[in-house]
A protein has these predicted regions:
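Conserved alpha-helical positions within TPR/SEL1-like repeat arrays
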Residues: 268-272
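Alpha/propeptide regions of enzymes that mature by internal proteolysis
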Residues: 17-183, 190, 212-248, 254, ...
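Nucleic-acid 5′ end/cap handling module spanning
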Residues: 205-212
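Sec-dependent N-terminal signal peptides
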Residues: 3-13
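Active-site lining segments that contact anionic ligands and/or coordinate catalytic metals
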Residues: 185-187, 206
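Soluble secreted/lumenal catalytic domains
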Residues: 202-203, 232
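Core structural elements
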Residues: 188-196
Length: 283
């Protein structure tokens, strides 16, 4: 019955709002700031193909935006531009909402580098739809199986340990454990940008992962985060090899292997480091 009502609501919104060019990204997401590092991030899962192409927007030293429901992608780049010019997340979101004739079907959250957070869930977003704003984060969801999803995400984020990726991942997993998207699951994404911007995007990107189409996108995202960390250590190992710091390189290659034991190549580089250091017997 709920699904039938949801379908009727979906159709009525599409007709009455005349927004056929928009896409209904029914999903759950989090925008967050790591107060210690200044890193900004967005994480999201949806039963929609390639959600990472539309929902998450982050700029180092500026802010982060998640735009979903009947998504208007402009909220992402336009929100970041306003925050970069000095506008708070609250004022930036209000400015864009005030100009949007279809704000009733939008769900948007913004956070700026100073920790100001704001979120909007339009009154015609498909139920269950809600958001929770907390200290340095906002979680939001629409078309959920249960109304408890945002609260569960907030609790998980606040009570989890680790870095920003760990905490945002905990929020996504909590949402799924509460029932998640009423339609199922298909894609996920996580983007984290540096708290110390250089102005060079690839240098400022701490993590950028997209699961485009997968039966268990959160499990795959978590796996790729682990592999990402492995290669972060491998890259540090390469750096130390360039500096002829063999012991430091070995430490990093070993950590890489611990994160990604399925990959036989990573121990190989430990052996290479030992040989280059004249420690052939240990290799």
């Amino acid at each position: 019955m709920r699904l039938f009502i949801t379908c009727l609501l979906f159709c009525s919104i599409s007709i009455s709002q005349n927004i056929s060019d928009q896409r209904p990204i029914s999903t759950y997401s989090i925008v967050a700031l790591d107060e210690e590092t200044g890193e900004l991030g967005v994480a999201v899962q949806s039963n929609w193909f390639s959600v990472g192409f539309l929902v998450p927007w982050v700029k180092a030293g500026v802010g982060a935006v998640a735009t979903q429901s009947f998504v208007k992608v402009d909220y992402g780049p336009d929100g970041l531009k306003l925050m970069e010019r000095g506008m708070s997340a609250t004022n930036a979101l209000k400015s864009l909402i005030d100009k949007d004739e279809a704000e009733a079907v939008r769900q948007v959250a913004m956070i700026d580098i100073n920790g100001n957070v704001s979120a909007h869930t339009g009154e015609r977003c498909i139920v269950f739809a809600n958001h929770v704003v907390g200290n340095n984060y906002s979680v939001q969801a629409n078309m959920m199986e249960n109304s408890t999803v945002p609260k569960a995400m907030a609790i998980a984020f606040e009570n989890s340990t680790g870095d920003l990726a760990d905490k945002m991942m905990a929020a996504l997993e909590a949402a799924e454990n509460e029932g998640g998207d009423i339609r199922g699951k298909q894609s996920a994404a996580m983007v984290i940008m540096s708290g110390k911007p250089t102005g060079v995007e690839w240098k400022d990107t701490k993590l950028s992962l997209r699961i485009e189409d997968h039966p268990t996108p959160l499990k795959e995202l978590k796996r790729l985060i682990r592999i990402h960390r492995a290669y972060q250590h491998a890259n540090k190992g390469d750096y130390y090899m360039e500096k002829d710091q063999i012991d430091n390189a070995l430490i990093e290659y070993t950590k890489a292997s611990e994160y990604y034991p399925e990959n036989p190549e990573l121990p190989y580089w430990s052996a290479v480091a030992l040989v280059n250091g004249g420690r052939v017997n240990e290799a």
